[in-house]
Amino acid sequence: MPTVTLNRIPINYVVTGSGPRVLLIMGAGSPGRVWNTYQVPALVKAGFEVVTMDNRGITNTVGIEGMSIADLAADAAALIEHLGGPAHVIGTSLGSRVVQELAITRPELVVKAIMLATTGKPYPVESALNRGQQALHHAGIDLPPAYTAAVNVLLNLSPQTLADPQKAQEWLDIFEYSAPTTTSPGIRAQTAMDRSRDRLSDLATILAPTLVVGFGDDRMTPPTQGIEVAAAIPGARYQQIEHCGHFGYLEKPDAVNALLIAFLHGHPLPTRL
């Protein structure tokens, strides 16, 4: 994985494929390689150069003190400039808020913007979870990976997925296997970032063609949050994928990828998802 120093911090990134550039920005606590299972292969096959990156705090502790969404957006902007110019930008969860910030502050770098599982203002459930995680961190408590996996599955997946015991166990195994035994300082810093600002009024300044994708069973950022974001951005489109939760890009990858590719190519968006 190449590493480049930008904004005085090392940034890990990977470039795959060729064609119009697409930068994928992951959510809190997850490395860029999470996109590799489904989105990267589909976008490369569709004729795009795909860039994934590790957000500040994922792989090292440089520059994490007092870090903000604006810092993550500045890192993404610096990487786009390093690679030679504007890009389509896609983000999920925290990554979608980074996309918002990037589209507001550096519009010349964003060709099209896609926001998955997004919100433009604080949401009480997410805020309460972040406060709880910070309290555990300050107390020096790391929960057992099996318990963390169960909580993540319940919070981020659809009841329809979990209704199948075999699928539920598969997801539990995946989450437990990938869960760190201790939470790194960088991920703690991501959790502690200020998300209290209501950004809805600022979204009206976004110039890039924008697609907002909501997931019908998302408990972390309910679809109503995404609908608000789309309504706030001039000309933005909103599409909803049912029977998937906050990790809809993993639960319903074919439906998500169909939307991404159609929007980026300028084709009509699929309606049967």
Labelled PLM ranges:
Residues 206, 212-214:
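Short beta-strand/loop motif that positions the catalytic acidic residue
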Residues 51-90:
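Active-site loop/oxyanion-hole signature of alpha/beta-hydrolase fold enzymes
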Residues 104, 112-142:
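Flexible "cap/lid" loop of the alpha/beta hydrolase fold
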Residues 96-107, 113:
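Short glycine-enriched nucleophile-adjacent loop
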